[in-house]
Amino acid sequence: MLELDLQIASETPAPDEARFRLWCEMGLRQRSADSELTIRLVDETEGRELNHTWRHKNYATNVLSFPADVPDDMLDIPLLGDLVICVPVVNREAAEQGKSIDAHWAHMVIHGCLHLLGYDHIDDEEAEEMEALERTLLEELGYPDPYADDESADHPHSDTPSKDHE
């Protein structure tokens, strides 16, 4: 069972809770245990502040992943962590990349969920593994390959703040 806490702190239109639940369940499908996570939808001001605080980057990014650092046996429901998604950035990226809003949102949510499960894209091998899983999950939902038109290694990855900052 997925316990999802959707916090809306942005006035920019975003998908509904049912879509987020579907995308999270797909991204967390390999996890058999119950899971709890929070998705906070923010505007660019809050997105920039969080990215600056945790990553020392002075711009709003699409998705920040904050994995929980609490042993599962200390909680009734295993807390995976939090995703902070900057709504205007995700919507703008979809338009700039010629992707449907729904497909790009699904990609960002699944990408963030995979970070909460421990996947990363720091080196090429990890990135290839993570991207392959994203492609598979998105294809099962009927969405196109999010990396099909990429000619460089610069993908719209979400960012996971280092645990050194927690």
Swiss-Prot record:
GO terms for cellular component: cytoplasm. It holds the Pfam family YbeY. GO terms for molecular function: metalloendopeptidase activity; RNA endonuclease activity; zinc ion binding. Its cofactor is Zn(2+). Keywords: Cytoplasm, Endonuclease, Hydrolase, Metal-binding, Nuclease, Ribosome biogenesis, rRNA processing, Zinc. One of its GO terms (biological process) is rRNA processing. PROSITE patterns: UPF0054. The keyword Membrane does not apply. Belongs to the endoribonuclease YbeY family. This is Endoribonuclease YbeY. It comes from Pseudomonas syringae pv. tomato (strain ATCC BAA-871 / DC3000). The gene is ybeY.
